[in-house]
């Protein structure tokens, strides 16, 4: 029996892909000394990961293009699995604020019943190091539009007190959804930069903990926080994110509640996955420390891809043509194939890193330059590989019968892939929670053939 999952701020579905499993990854990203039992099958290039116990029943994002990309992947995936047309209405486009208000105004069917897990990467632009770091003081509304006191008269006048409907406080509406659906567990993701903004992390943790809480503190949610580095889980990228994980206290066994309430949670009870990869020779103390392998180099996921002009894959054909702006600017460096790739960004104003630079601009990949390969930025497929999206996920989707017209363009695709949680990191989280489900909630998981 699958566990029903509700996905918020879903974007193109990186978290959803990981939590459902059943996708393929290049062999180089998996530590088979530790995770061999995750593999359903393999071929020369890929490992096909097993499905998990989770199934997405509701997804939501304000970006209409996210739905197009999400549906393109998931409907195709589910149709092939079930030999029937998948439900096209799982993904609902719109602001989370408007959807919650729709529920509050009487449409109680807006959210599915029997939701056991809620996930969501609430908007990070206001907390990001690469953004303007407005945090709670964001002056954009829940639709991403700038808030003005009187925009008709003066476009420079801003509101003085951001409300809970501003972009920096949309996690409060995720909280509302959790209060409505009452899942056993929820996972909220954001950028590491949030931890450096004063008391923001503690405030968000306290707000989530307050869900359905009573004075005796026996109800509500027990909320944990931890920063995870994607590179420690095989993702060939330097990407750090904070994960808030909340447990419904009344759903936990007494033993699990006691263990999860400790200042230091044991390896057995923690919901956070144990690292499988080393970054730079740092010391690890986990039970798996002797089985860990070195991080996945960028070369491992990039070297086998054809050059764009030779590829039939639209996500490999199209890439940013923004000109080189000088090494002092963001996104003007060449990916070092022997290291982790830099963080794949969502913004697309000439800040997509280079797959290779010319000699004149400091390029160092002589082997490729000598073959006549041209200076260019990372393609969508290369960004997707670095993020561990499966190769059958399309980030550039052409309009049928219309040459050079797109349902999802390359420019949009860069934003989608850069905003996503790496599916492999999400899979590590999902498998840890799956393996501990009975430990936490006392419910035996009935295994199926491919779980």
Describe the role of every protein-language-model region.
Residues 2-87:
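Conserved S-adenosyl-L-methionine
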Residues 94:
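Cofactor-binding loops of NAD(P)H-dependent oxidoreductases
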Residues 99-115, 125, 129-339:
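Class I S-adenosyl-L-methionine
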Residues 39-58, 152-165, 368-372:
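Intrinsically disordered, low-complexity acidic Ser/Thr-rich regulatory segments
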Residues 13-14, 65, 123-127, 192-193, ...:
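Short, solvent-exposed loop/turn segments at secondary-structure junctions
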Residues 57, 89, 115-116, 184:
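Conserved acidic residues
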């Amino acid at each position: 029996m699958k566990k029903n999952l509700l996905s918020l701020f879903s974007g193109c579905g990186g978290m959803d892909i990981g939590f459902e499993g059943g996708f393929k990854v290049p062999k180089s990203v998996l530590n088979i000394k530790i995770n061999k039992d995750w593999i359903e099958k393999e071929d020369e290039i890929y490992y096909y990961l097993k499905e998990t116990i989770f199934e997405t029943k509701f997804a939501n994002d304000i970006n209409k293009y996210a739905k197009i990309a999400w549906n393109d992947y998931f409907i195709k995936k589910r149709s092939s699995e079930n030999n029937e047309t998948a439900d096209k209405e799982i993904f609902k486009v719109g602001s989370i604020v408007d959807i919650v208000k729709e529920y509050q105004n009487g449409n109680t069917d807006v959210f599915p019943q029997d939701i056991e897990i809620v996930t969501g990467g609430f908007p990070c632009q206001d907390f990001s190091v690469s953004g303007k770091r407005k945090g709670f003081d964001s002056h954009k509304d829940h639709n991403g539009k700038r808030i003005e006191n009187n925009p008709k008269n003066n476009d420079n006048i801003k509101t003085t007190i951001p409300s809970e409907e501003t972009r920096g406080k949309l996690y409060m509406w995720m909280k509302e959804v959790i209060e409505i659906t009452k899942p056993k567990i929820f996972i909220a993701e954001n950028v590491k930069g949030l931890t450096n903004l004063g008391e923001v992390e503690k405030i968000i943790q306290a707000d989530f903990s307050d869900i359905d809480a009573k004075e005796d503190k026996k109800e509500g949610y027990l909320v944990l926080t931890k920063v995870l580095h994607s590179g420690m889980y095989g993702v060939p990228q330097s990407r750090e994110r904070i994960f808030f994980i909340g447990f419904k206290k009344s759903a936990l066994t007494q033993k699990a509640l006691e263990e999860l309430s400790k200042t230091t949670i044991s390896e057995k009870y923690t919901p956070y996955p144990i690292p499988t990869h080393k970054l730079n020779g740092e010391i690890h103390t986990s039970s798996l420390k002797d089985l860990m392998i070195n991080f996945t180099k960028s070369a491992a996921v990039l070297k086998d891809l054809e050059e764009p002009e030779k590829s039939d894959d639209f996500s490999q054909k199209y890439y940013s043509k923004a000109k080189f702006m000088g090494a002092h600017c963001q996104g003007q460096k060449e990916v070092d194939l022997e290291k982790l790739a830099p963080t794949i960004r969502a913004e697309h104003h000439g800040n997509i890193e280079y797959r290779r630079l010319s000699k004149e601009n400091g390029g160092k990949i002589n082997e490729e330059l000598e073959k006549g390969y041209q200076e260019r930025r990372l393609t969508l497929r290369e960004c997707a590989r670095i993020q561990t999206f499966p190769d059958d996920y399309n980030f550039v989707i052409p309009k049928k019968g219309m040459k050079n017209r797109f349902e999802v363009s390359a420019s949009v695709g860069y934003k989608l892939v850069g905003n996503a949680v790496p599916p492999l990191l999400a899979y590590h989280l999902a498998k840890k929670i799956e393996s501990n489900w009975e430990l936490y909630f006392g419910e035996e998981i009935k295994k199926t053939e491919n779980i």
